[in-house]
Amino acid sequence: MGNLFARKRRSRVTEQDKAVLQLKQQRDKLKQYQKKITLQLQRERELAKQLLHDGKKEKAKLLLKKKRYQEQLLEKTDNQISNLEKMVDDIEFAQIEMKVIEGLKVGNEWLKKMHEVMSIEEVEKIMEETQEGIEYQRQIDEMLSGSLTAEDEEAILEELEAITQEDLELPEAPSEPLSDTVPEKQAVKNRPKPQLVAAS
């Protein structure tokens, strides 16, 4: 049942494609005919050679006349094949040109729609506003960079010098190791107390 409701696919084969196919088929038939005539000419030449060898000169001459006629046909076949191939190339190139033209047409339509949405005046306005924004930001940057006076610069240098001096005035750490001796007062505290002895 699915086939009953399925949409019929559109054939992608164009009239130009059919024409190219027919031309190529005719070309292939001519090439087959050309191959057949070429083989026949080779056989007839060998046969004429044999007739001359057998002393049948008139028959050989008649056969060579036929061969000459077939060679002329072969030459015409070459020209026809060349014409067919040229026509195939022309049609295929014309198809490419048509696709290019269709692409250009679609592109032009989109450009027109874009131009309708955005006019030249709007573009100029946007560019002008963008330039104004850039100029405004530049002025802000200049104000920020030029806001420090000479006094401010001097105060910054003085503060930098003061911080440097603080680092220089810090006491140095002792370079020798500390001794393990107990201070004298601590030694006195640790002495044993004298004990009183009762008189006898």
Curated annotation (Swiss-Prot):
Residues 165-200 are annotated as: Disordered. This is Charged multivesicular body protein 6-B. PANTHER family: CHARGED MULTIVESICULAR BODY PROTEIN (PTHR22761), CHARGED MULTIVESICULAR BODY PROTEIN 6 (PTHR22761:SF5). The gene is chmp6-b. A lipid is attached at residue 2 (N-myristoyl glycine). InterPro entries: Snf7_fam. Belongs to the SNF7 family. It comes from Xenopus laevis. It comes from the Eukaryota. A motif (Type-2 MIT-interacting motif) lies at residues 168-179. It is a lipid-anchor. It is found in: Endomembrane system; Late endosome membrane. GO terms for cellular component: ESCRT III complex; late endosome membrane; multivesicular body. GO terms for biological process: late endosome to vacuole transport via multivesicular body sorting pathway; protein transport; vesicle budding from membrane. Keywords: Coiled coil, Endosome, Lipoprotein, Membrane, Myristate, Protein transport, Transport. Residues 9-102 form a coiled coil. Its main location: membrane. Probable core component of the endosomal sorting required for transport complex III (ESCRT-III) which is involved in multivesicular bodies (MVBs) formation and sorting of endosomal cargo proteins into MVBs. MVBs contain intraluminal vesicles (ILVs) that are generated by invagination and scission from the limiting membrane of the endosome and mostly are delivered to lysosomes enabling degradation of membrane proteins, such as stimulated growth factor receptors, lysosomal enzymes and lipids. Probable core component of the endosomal sorting required for transport complex III (ESCRT-III). ESCRT-III components are thought to multimerize to form a flat lattice on the perimeter membrane of the endosome.
